[in-house]
């Protein structure tokens, strides 16, 4: 355990006693170092190690602690003012820094300090919360929300109105993760630490939480909390045990490999689900 992690872990145990007025200098410095590290991409709340996603709980704890040590203050916006404990990521950015970091931010997009945005990312009028990581080449479309500590892979498209759940409110054990080369259709929601593995296509209006049945129509298998790599998923329903009613589920209608995903358009994949 690093010294930084040790300070965070110890502070979290006494978090109820920490306020902006009582926090000691060493604890404040450690928390701010973590937030800066998350902001720059040095730290990630979750990362893939030996093929498995690992959550660094101490980083999440630092994010939670950051709310304990800061007072609300005025935040200036172009059209209004805000009043919050967390600064905005781009408050001090110059044109040169935007150009250097290599992403686009459309007016009304909001990113909190402590979120990392990779090169070649486009942020339409959307919201990215503290602790989140957005991978290279990703499009966060209009009114999409990337929740606190959520992990978004490379070359992902989060369509209009998509919601990717956070870990802070309500408190979740693990962040929601969207793998590389995924497409999440408009108004879909992926929450509660669900993992969408690489190369998945999620149709419009699909809602997936930890208790959602994810039914593979080819195998009959039911998954919880994980969408297998290469899945094409639509909303559906499954009959109850007594056959009297149906309950919502997500349905894996087919699997595609990276080569097929690269060659075939998203609309074609979704329109051919009856094949």
Curated annotation (Swiss-Prot):
Catalytic activity entry: (S)-2,3,4,5-tetrahydrodipicolinate + succinyl-CoA + H2O = (S)-2-succinylamino-6-oxoheptanedioate + CoA
EC number, UniProt record: 2.3.1.117
Higher taxonomy: Bacteria, Pseudomonadati, Pseudomonadota, Gammaproteobacteria, Pasteurellales
UniProt pathway: Amino-acid biosynthesis; L-lysine biosynthesis via DAP pathway; LL-2,6-diaminopimelate from (S)-tetrahydrodipicolinate (succinylase route): step 1/3
Pfam family, one: Hexapep_2
UniProt keyword annotations, A-Z: Acyltransferase, Amino-acid biosynthesis, Cytoplasm, Diaminopimelate biosynthesis, Lysine biosynthesis, Repeat, Transferase
GO terms under cellular component: cytoplasm
Family designation: Belongs to the transferase hexapeptide repeat family.
Location(s), subcellular: Cytoplasm
GO MF entry, a single one: nucleotidyltransferase activity
Protein name: 2,3,4,5-tetrahydropyridine-2,6-dicarboxylate N-succinyltransferase
GO BP annotations, alphabetical order: diaminopimelate biosynthetic process; lysine biosynthetic process via diaminopimelate
Signal peptide: none
Residues bound to substrate: 104, 141
Assembly, per entry: Homotrimer.
SUPFAM superfamilies: Trimeric LpxA-like enzymes
Enzyme class: transferase
HAMAP family noted in UniProt: DapD (MF_00811)
């Amino acid at each position: 355990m690093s010294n930084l992690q040790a300070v965070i872990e110890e502070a979290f145990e006494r978090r109820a006693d920490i306020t902006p007025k009582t926090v000691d200098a060493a604890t404040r410095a450690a928390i701010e170092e973590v937030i800066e590290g998350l902001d720059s991409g040095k730290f990630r709340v979750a990362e893939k190690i030996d093929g498995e996603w690992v959550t660094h709980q101490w980083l999440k704890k630092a994010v939670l602690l950051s709310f304990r040590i800061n007072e609300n203050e005025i935040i200036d916006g172009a059209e209004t003012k805000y009043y919050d404990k967390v600064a905005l990521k781009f408050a001090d950015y110059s044109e040169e820094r935007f150009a250097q970091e290599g992403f686009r931010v459309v007016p009304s997009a909001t990113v909190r300090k402590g979120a990392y945005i990779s090169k070649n990312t486009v942020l339409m009028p959307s919201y990215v919360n503290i602790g989140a990581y957005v991978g290279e080449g990703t499009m966060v479309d209009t009114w999409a929300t990337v929740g606190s500590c959520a992990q978004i892979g490379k070359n992902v498209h989060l369509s209009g109105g998509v919601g990717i759940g956070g870990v802070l409110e309500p408190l979740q054990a693990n962040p929601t993760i969207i793998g590389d080369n995924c497409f999440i259709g408009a108004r879909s929601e992926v929450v509660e630490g669900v993992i969408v593995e690489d190369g998945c296509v999620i149709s419009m209006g699909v809602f997936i939480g930890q208790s959602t049945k994810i039914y593979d129509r080819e195998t009959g298998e039911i998954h919880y909390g994980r969408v297998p790599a290469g899945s094409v998923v639509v909303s559906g329903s499954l009959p109850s045990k007594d056959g009297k009613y149906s309950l919502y589920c997500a349905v894996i209608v087919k699997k595609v490999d990276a080569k097929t995903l690269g060659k075939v358009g998203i609309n074609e994949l979704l329109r051919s689900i009856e094949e």
